[in-house]
A protein has these predicted regions:
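Binuclear metal-dependent hydrolase catalytic cores
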Residues: 1-174, 183, 238-247
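Hydrophobic pocket-lining residues within nucleotide cofactor-binding pockets
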Residues: 139, 156, 198, 230, ...
Length: 250
């Protein structure tokens, strides 16, 4: 069965501290270009009247209001670092508006880390009070179905840690990667759209660079690519000029 048509909304594409960065007076952080205002990285996938969120950033409340998200049907976590998980408590308004617990998908180590951060959300007694109501579902690396759309976990390296990116239909979302193993590259063939980590131009121990991610796009032959987890080293206008001069897909 073919994947249902879906819409991807980019809720944030900034690095862990966001852009502008607190206390910074560089050209990007003081830019008046709204495209240089980047919240923490997350996307929303909408289809068949459903909304599936990848990661709950500390900016999630702002992101939900900006994108007019009124209902949330499932959440998928890439990993448990603060810039990807600390917005979980902002689920409460969705519980007020819709019945039932919201399914939350994550690898076992990611779920355990989130549980340690938010023990009251996982406590059955606390569920009787005004806390987010979720249904934890553990990922084992196998494909899983969400409302007719298949999601495939893609193992990627975030420094010394293995985390998940996800392929869904003809698209894939990979953030916070310093390396994509060959076995995972094989799972990313025949894509139309990909989101890749591109923190900055200079090398970083736990994140990809612009040039490295461009090479990944070329190797995969993806029709269209978007970069995310971008820091204040990259102003949008300058990056777009550089992109137009060297690569058509990105």
């Amino acid at each position: 069965m073919p994947a249902p048509p879906f819409k991807i909304t980019v809720l944030g594409s900034g690095t862990s501290v966001g852009v502008p960065t607190i206390g910074c007076h560089c050209a990007v952080c003081t830019s008046t270009d709204p495209r240089d205002n980047r919240l923490r990285p997350s996307i929303l996938i909408s289809y068949e009247g459903r909304n599936v969120l990848i990661d709950t950033t500390p900016d999630f409340r702002t992101q939900a209001l900006r994108a007019h998200i009124e209902r949330l049907h499932a959440v998928v976590f890439t990993h448990a670092h603060a810039d990807h998980a600390m917005g979980l408590d902002d689920f409460r308004p969705f519980n007020f508006r819709q019945s039932g617990d919201i399914p939350v998908y994550a690898a076992p180590d990611t779920m355990n880390s989130i549980r340690r951060c938010f023990p009251y959300i996982f406590d059955s007694e606390e569920k009787k009070t005004n806390v987010p109501h979720i249904e934890p579902r553990l990922l084992d690396g196998s494909p899983f179905d969400l409302f007719g759309l298949k999601f495939l976990p893609i193992p990627i390296l975030h420094g010394p840690h293995t985390i998940y990116g996800f392929r869904f239909g003809n698209a894939a979302y990979l953030t916070d990667h310093s390396e994509i193993p060959d076995s995972s590259m094989d799972l990313l063939r025949s894509l139309d759209v990909i989101f890749l980590d591109a923190l900055r131009y200079k090398p970083h121990p736990t994140h990809s660079t612009v040039e490295r991610s461009i090479k990944t796009v070329e190797k995969l032959g993806v029709r269209r690519a978007f970069f995310t987890h971008i820091c204040h080293d990259l102003g949008h206008e300058r990056a777009e000029i550089g992109r137009a001069s060297c690569r058509e897909r990105v």
